[in-house]
Amino acid sequence: MSAFAGADTRGELSTEECRRVVDEIAAVNPNVFLILTGGEPLLRKDLFAIADYAAERRFTVVLGTNGVLLREREAKLMRAHGMLGASISLDSTLSTRHDAFRHQAGAWDGAVRATRVLADEGLDFSLHMSVTDWNVTEIPAMIDLARELGAKVLNFFFLVRTGRGRDLTDIDAAAYERILTYLARAQGEGSGPPSFVQRLLAGARGEDPNRRSSRDPSGVGAVFEDPWSTPVGRADGLLIRAKCAPHFRRILYQLNPDSPLLKNYAHGSCPAGKYYCRITPEADVTPCPYMPVAAGNLRTSSFAELWRDAAVFADLRDPKLGGRCGACEFSKICGGCRCRAYATYGDYLAEDPACAYQPGAHGGDLIELPASLTFGAPVAYELRWDDDARARLQAIPSFARGMVVKAVEAYARGRGERVVTRALLADVRAQWGGRFRPRP
């Protein structure tokens, strides 16, 4: 993300230090999902050597990039060195607006070109859009563009005002509710994009939200012509996710408690400090790219020491939340964005200021998701898995493995199968659209 862009490379981890860190991570968890990002990771001459080293240790390795330097040569190197895909930053459907936001002429063209060379090389990619007040009206168009480009995932990153993001203007809490509801309904939870979202976006464009037309007396279609008003999402193989907005899961639950989109983490919806952390180029370990609270430094402590013993991680794994988040019945599903709380109040356990929900409105009793919808759940076999199937399972990132086992076994039981085999896993992969891609 642009909030952490910079050209100063002094003090960065060397190639050998990166390899040591990979080994230290593998000692804690040998099946890590590793994102090599920046800044711009393609500026590092040793990027593919690091990726290769991690892939050899069975890490799932992907690239996070703005796409400008990603051409056919780089895509081929990605595949050759064990990378399974990339995430591309794209903040507008209009090249001039994206380039202005990224402070780089040609950035939009580079990002779009990168999606094409990745597709040509058979590598999956996701798109990341940083949502602020200036581009929020483009969300429906970005969904359409992501489908057109062939993205597997479209992540909307909602603003946390850190780094360069301090100078940006966030949308207010009421707008969060409306936009997140739109994203839920765009994926089939409900009857389509709600009129209040369409009216919100119309007002943000300076249009009359109450305008009527002869074709649409309600005024909804007058603002949103196709494809704006057409629900899109998983049916076309595109998964839409809201990032840095954990209250999205609360909204999903309110719309449909059985929503398949309610995949969660065992310790709450945000993985920061629980199943996820950032390692900076200078070796600091933080819970998330947007929280500048270091657990320690890998030049003075091992990864295992920091991961197991750091106070900030302990706080986030057993949080004593304050304000509305602490009193909320959705604290297990949501829990608020800890980085936004820190950026606003200087306290990562404070309430999330971007949430408009008042605790108790859904009854007040603590709501928890079943284990079948939980990332980080322990692996519990109820059917027999042959050796080949178990070997394939080891390539699934460990945080998702327990949930994958439950889903695969449910699929097997539905077909009357008593043993999970490699062939059955191939059938499941076809059903899931290849989102999990274990290496052969």
Enumerate the language-model features and the residues they cover.
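Residues at the N-termini of beta-strands
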Residues: 33, 85, 151-153, 336
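Conserved, mostly hydrophobic/aromatic
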Residues: 36, 54, 63, 88, ...
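Radical SAM enzyme [4Fe-4S]-AdoMet core and its adjacent flexible, acidic
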Residues: 6-8, 81, 89-91, 96-271, ...
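Aromatic/hydrophobic pocket-lining residues that form π-stacking "cages" and hydrophobic walls in ligand
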Residues: 21, 50, 54, 114, ...
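Non-catalytic accessory segments flanking P-loop/AAA+ NTPase cores
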Residues: 376-440
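Flexible mid-to-C-terminal extensions adjoining Fe-S/redox cofactors in radical SAM and related proteins
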Residues: 284-285, 290-378
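Structural motif corresponding to alpha-helix initiation and N-cap regions
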Residues: 15, 19, 44, 71-72, ...
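Conserved alpha-helical substructure of the radical SAM core
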Residues: 1-85, 174
